[in-house]
Amino acid sequence: MTKTTWLTYNDLAWTDSLITSPEECKEETEYFVRTIRDHSRIEVQTLLHLGCGAGMNDYTFKRHFKVTGVDMSAGMLEIARTLNPEVTYVCHDMRTVTLEQRFDAVAIPDSIGYMITERDLRNTITTAREHLKPGGVLLIVALVREDFQENNFVYTGSREEVEVTIFENNYVFDSHQTTYEATLVYLIRRKGELEIFTDRHTLGLFPLGTWFSLLADAGLEVKQITMEHAYDRFISHEGEYPLRVFTGVFRKTRFLGQTNQQC
């Protein structure tokens, strides 16, 4: 996992703002806000968003919290900083980032899938826990193995003379593996001229038992909710894409240092 692995988050990062918008993410993000507040044992004023991407969720998060976002894609952070100048953004790997500040809440709503080994997942959960104040809550949104379907998705968008269509195929090679493959095909037309790009992503797919075990091992009091229909509008055929929302309240304290880098 490196900063230059995927076109989606580097050379093609600009397509994200054509495919979706902060307004389209508002309803989903408001749901995350309510869930965070409902489960936290303390008043939530500060939020650490790990794997923040282009900042679409932050556009709504910042209306409720003082937000700090972390992502390892410089291309995505460039978009995020333009969209959300009020938000502090840090270029770093969410498995290892260490900030001087603790937060009332930590959210990972859209990027935990890139943890493809149990070790990576454990490290990310530990990093999140270490940035929580006692009584604060961690929110993670994940696709779990029990819910996986080999879906196909279609995303479209345009701006002026640029049209973008993205086809995504999800596939599991081995039912016993803890990963699946998401292959994306980009059709980009500029003034009618077509360019085609492909991008293959390996994503994590862990059973519920692993999630509960790792979250509990981190000292979190865990609850889980099923979130359905969030991606229904993008599925190209009959299918379902339920996601699990995990919340974990942290009661312990821990010293934090600082080792960061900026994009």
Predicted regions and their residues:
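SAM-dependent methyltransferase
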Residues: 139-212
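Class I SAM-dependent methyltransferase SAM/SAH-binding core
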Residues: 48, 55-96
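A short acidic, Gly/Pro-enriched loop at the edge of an enzyme's catalytic core
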Residues: 96-106
